[in-house]
C-alpha cells in the first residue's frame, strides 16, 4: 500500500460508488469482513474467468470477493491508469437470489485527478441509468485530508 503525502492528497479528488463485492460465498470461511472495515482492490490479471477481474481483499490480504462484472472493465482501466481504489464494507452479506452468490454491500472510493473522475462519473452514471443497476454515486469532490 502506497503512503500519500498531504501535498499529493491536496491535489487529489474522490468519487464514491455504493455497490457490492461478489463471490463472498467462495471466501467467507477463510476471510472475515466487518462492517466499517476498509477493503483494498487490485488487478487480477491471471483470473481465468475475466481479463478485467478486480479482486477485493481485506486488511489481512485475504480475498473476500471481486468487483461485479458490470463494473470490472471500468475499474480495471481506472486502476491501470490511476492506481487507487478502496472499498468500505457498509452492511451485512446478502444473497439476492440472482445467481450472484453471497455479496457484500460496499462503498467503493476511487481517488484520482478531477478531470479523470468527472469523466468516469459521467460514464458510470450513464451505465447506471441504461441498465438500472441502482448504484449510488457521489459527486466528484476534493479528498478529505
Model-derived regions, located:
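Conserved active-site motif detector
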Residues: 1-145
Amino acid at each position: 500500500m502506497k503512503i500519500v503525502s498531504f501535498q499529493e492528497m491536496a491535489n487529489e479528488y474522490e468519487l464514491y460508488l455504493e455497490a457490492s463485492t461478489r463471490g463472498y460465498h467462495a471466501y467467507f470461511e477463510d476471510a472475515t469482513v466487518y462492517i466499517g472495515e476498509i477493503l483494498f482492490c487490485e488487478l487480477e490479471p491471471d483470473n481465468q474467468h475475466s481479463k478485467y477481474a478486480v479482486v477485493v481483499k481485506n486488511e489481512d490480504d485475504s480475498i473476500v470477493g471481486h468487483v461485479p462484472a458490470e463494473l470490472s472493465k471500468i475499474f480495471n482501466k481506472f486502476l491501470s491508469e490511476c492506481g487507487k481504489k478502496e472499498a468500505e464494507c457498509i452492511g451485512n452479506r446478502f444473497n439476492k437470489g440472482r445467481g450472484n452468490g453471497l455479496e457484500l454491500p460496499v462503498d467503493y472510493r476511487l481517488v484520482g485527478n478531477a478531470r479523470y473522475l468527472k469523466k468516469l462519473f459521467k460514464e458510470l452514471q450513464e451505465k447506471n441509468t441504461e441498465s438500472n443497476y441502482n448504484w449510488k454515486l457521489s459527486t466528484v469532490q476534493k479528498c478529505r485530508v
